[in-house]
From Swiss-Prot:
Gene name of the record: rsmH
Coiled-coil intervals: none
Entry protein name: Ribosomal RNA small subunit methyltransferase H
Role of this protein: Specifically methylates the N4 position of cytidine in position 1402 (C1402) of 16S rRNA.
Pfam families referenced in this protein's UniProt entry, alphabetically: Methyltransf_5
């Protein structure tokens, strides 16, 4: 299947990366290489681009799409939480910019057998990296009712979390829930008809929650930002695109922590932590897509871009 993904906030990202022709730049979520190609085009033969992705299909597609720039490009098949370790493996110890687009690519959503979409029936999977064994099937069929309630509430921000979890546990007592279609049916039964009439698809929030849990999406964000900052040259920038409030809050807080000086409790008269500010925040408020972009690519509607610069 053709790996198709419309890059979100493309011009805004490239502009905010402040790309130097001979710099070293990392795309943590290469996907279809839309952002990546624009970065690579701005590099000279002395520059270097490193693209990360945990989806082997994305790596294959990116290699094709960036083949004309082969001499200045390297690929890493890994989760971006390993950014520091993986870069060290290829002899890269300092970088000049990092980009991460935290959305699920439209390719993954559209490829039915990956199990990301609530619009198509498929095995319950949702693994970004198919080398991992843990899948959506395990979450849906082995988590306790309390555990399901917690992730649907925390990661999906769904008001019906408790009821959805209860219905899932009751349904799987008869037989395992094996497909996305079966899960959607359970969710629809759990949410009262009146509540289903308004708002997004009733399964949207639960699917988001399970996907985040399967791929530990929130757990890896802060580590990646901290590690990227630790190897960033002065003036280098970290650009992160998020798609829901949980991710955005994590990025905002990670930037805030890196930008702050002393973090000692207020009652201490003298600083004990010796923490110094590592970055300055470029975007006090996130950059949002234009109305024109939303019209062309409705999936960009919830995107937010935050930027920090190493000092």
């Amino acid at each position: 299947m053709e790996f198709h993904h419309v890059s979100v906030l493309l011009n805004e990202c490239i502009e905010n990366l402040n790309i130097k022709p001979d710099g070293v730049y990392v795309d943590c979520t290469m996907g279809g290489a839309g952002h990546s190609k624009e970065i690579v085009k701005k590099l000279s033969d002395k520059g270097l681009f490193i693209g990360f992705d945990q989806d082997k299909n994305a790596i294959s597609t990116a290699k094709e799409r960036l083949s004309e720039y082969e001499s200045r490009v390297k690929f890493v098949h890994s989760n971006f939480e390993n950014i520091k370790e993986e870069l060290e493996k290829i002899g890269v110890y300092k970088i000049d910019g990092v980009l991460a687009d935290l959305g699920v690519s439209s390719h993954q959503l559209d490829e039915a057998d990956r199990g990301f979409s609530y619009m198509q029936d498929a095995p319950l999977d949702m693994r970004m990296d198919v080398r991992c064994e843990f899948s959506a099937y395990d979450v849906v069929n082995t988590y306790t009712e309390d555990e399901l309630t917690k992730i649907i509430k925390d990661y999906g921000e769904d008001n019906w979390a408790k009821r959805i979890a209860k219905f899932i546990v009751e349904e799987r007592a008869n037989k395992p829930i094996e497909t996305t279609g079966e899960l959607v049916d359970v969710i629809k039964k759990a949410i009262p008809k009146k509540a289903r009439i308004v708002g997004p698809h009733p399964a949207k929030r639960t699917f988001q929650a399970i996907r985040i849990e399967v791929n530990n999406e929130l757990g890896v964000i802060t580590k990646m930002i901290n590690d990227a900052s630790s190897i960033m040259n002065e003036g280098g920038r970290i650009c992160i695109i998020t798609f829901h409030s949980l991710e955005d809050r994590i990025v905002k807080n990670a930037f805030k922590h890196l930008a702050s000086d002393c973090i000692c409790p207020q009652h201490l008269p003298i600083c004990q932590c010796d923490k110094e500010s590592e970055v300055k925040i470029i975007t006090r408020k996130p950059i949002l897509p234009s109305e024109e972009e939303i019209e062309v690519n409705p999936r960009s509607r919830s995107a937010k871009l935050r930027v920090a610069e190493k000092i």
